[in-house]
């Protein structure tokens, strides 16, 4: 996160860190939505993933963090009214439930859709400088604004975004504050509700008039809840 500050240790209880297992390199963030399930971005997927829950400072090994592996991974493959931009979402079932603690607690799914103009909180261990990468040991947090989708469409002509989309657009139009590389998969929390997943942005982050794109959690609720409930057939939303 660019232009943010170190997160308060109590405001990131649901934030998880995804690593590539063999190289032990940090990949992405993710969000614990209950004891056994994590929501992140599909583009964070690797063949072998390690998930740390309850981490704050990545450089310090301490006994409060819990290590898990994906038992199952689910990708959103609905075609009707969804474009490729709307599908950057991955649901991971952990190999065993985590134990909640002082620094580990889930973030509940949203009860209503996000409202343009909302102030949203972002957080992650992504780079704090751009275009040079500087990865911090601790997660950084910042506030950005939920913008109209059309702003992102105009800002990123190279993406050729569709005229309408289920993707969220958020940032600070003056520049200086933004999610960036390796914040992917982490949460966008608007008015206290988990509304988005860090997806894509400009190569150089935090530029003026270049807000970033976030997968919209609310439009995937049925899919998420069906999978968690163990439903064999997952109906695509209309």
Curated annotation (Swiss-Prot):
Q: Which GO terms describe its molecular function?
A: serine-type endopeptidase activity; toxin activity
Q: Which InterPro entries match?
A: Peptidase_S1_PA, Peptidase_S1_PA_chymotrypsin, Peptidase_S1A, Trypsin_dom, TRYPSIN_HIS
UniProt tissue specificity: Expressed by the venom gland.
Q: How does it assemble?
A: Monomer.
Record Gene3D superfamilies:
Trypsin-like serine proteases
Q: What is the protein's species of origin?
A: Crotalus durissus terrificus (South American rattlesnake)
Q: Spell out where the chain is glycosylated.
A: 81
Q: Which cysteines are joined by disulfide bonds?
A: 7-141, 28-44, 78-236, 120-190, 152-169, 180-205
Q: What is this protein called?
A: Thrombin-like enzyme gyroxin B2.1
Q: Which UniProt keywords apply?
A: Blood coagulation cascade activating toxin, Disulfide bond, Glycoprotein, Hemostasis impairing toxin, Hydrolase, Protease, Secreted, Serine protease, Toxin
